[in-house]
Amino acid sequence: MSESTIGIIVNGATGRMGYRQHLVRSLLAIHGQGGVVTKDGTRQQIEIMIIGRNEATLKELAAKHGIEHYTTDLDAALADPRWQIYFDALVTQARVKGIKKAIAAGKHVYTEKPTAESSEEAFELARLAKEAGVKNGVVHDKLYLPGLQKLKRLIDSGFFGQILSVRGEFGYWVFEGDWQQAQRPSWNYRSEDGGGIIVDMFPHWNYVFENLFGRVESVYARTATHIPTRVGEDGEAYTATADDAAYGVFDLAGGIVAQVNSSWVVRVDRKELVEFQVDGTLGSAVVGLFGAKIQPRNATPRPTWNPDLAETHDYTADWLEIPTNEVFENGFKTQWEQFLLHVIEDAPHPYDFTAGARGVLLAEAGLESNATGRRIDLPNT
């Protein structure tokens, strides 16, 4: 490995997200293009070390993708100065221990979300990283989706006027695992293993809200475990102890009201698996993973309520599709490149451990709201 090469420890490369989005779509793609381009125009190459518990699995994965370095010994990898960055894609329960070790070893740290199971631990990680002087970042992948980037442009252009409300629909039907294999791992449905849709999705909604609309000031949430029994990877039935749906109302800074339904027990009747409708005084938009359509004020139809006559107007035809006039790369890869440049030349990357901790805090507040039946205020952290 060259002295100028950035060494990255990847812990959790055999998992669903760690493998597909981070290892294959991001890091191997960055390595294949020769690294990242710095502001002076030079390329900084990366080298990858994958870590896991099963050496045979790691060996097979390394051979498949031409990765030279792999190990089951995290401590030894962290002690090696060739590896400057530690990335964590483990299950949430195992995350804090590894990150603390990496910080203590002086490594820069990038991690999947949520950063911890509790906001106390999440803010502790932020404090430890700051005290150690290491760069730190948390995956904020939804911000890099083509649809949300188009939405950001609309907001920055003033298209909406005053933004009034945000409505979000996320989810799809995850099969129960009996007659059809589930698309998500069984631990997602066990609270004792760190599962639940609130702890998974509310951190996402937090960074979407605070980066596009304004920070979350309060939340009212209702959760449900609609399907109480599922079938695991071993073919055995198990009790689902975690929420599989969450219905949230969020008060955002500036008086914006947001409402998001998150569910793994909903059948999709929309163009994409997530859609947000943003309504403002001067116009509205509906955006998804890729698509975005708008309806300006001066092209808004004037409906009238008449239950005696069948509706003949096609309201979906009143929207104008935003053209895709640039190539959007994989969002995980784009953020990886930003974090690497943050490490190499202190380029901006605001999505740090403190931002990640605010997401954990919102998830906790959502669970507290569900338990108490109250709206929960959030501190400005």
Q: Which residues does each PLM region occupy?
A:
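N-terminal Rossmann-like dinucleotide-binding module
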Residues: 1-65
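Short acidic low-complexity segments
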Residues: 39-40, 69-81
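Hydrophobic residues in well-ordered beta-strands that form the structural core
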Residues: 111, 136-138, 167, 260, ...
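Predominantly a Rossmann-like dinucleotide-binding segment in NAD(P)-dependent oxidoreductases
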Residues: 142-240, 373
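Glycine-rich phosphate/pyrophosphate-binding beta-alpha loops
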Residues: 203, 262-269, 327
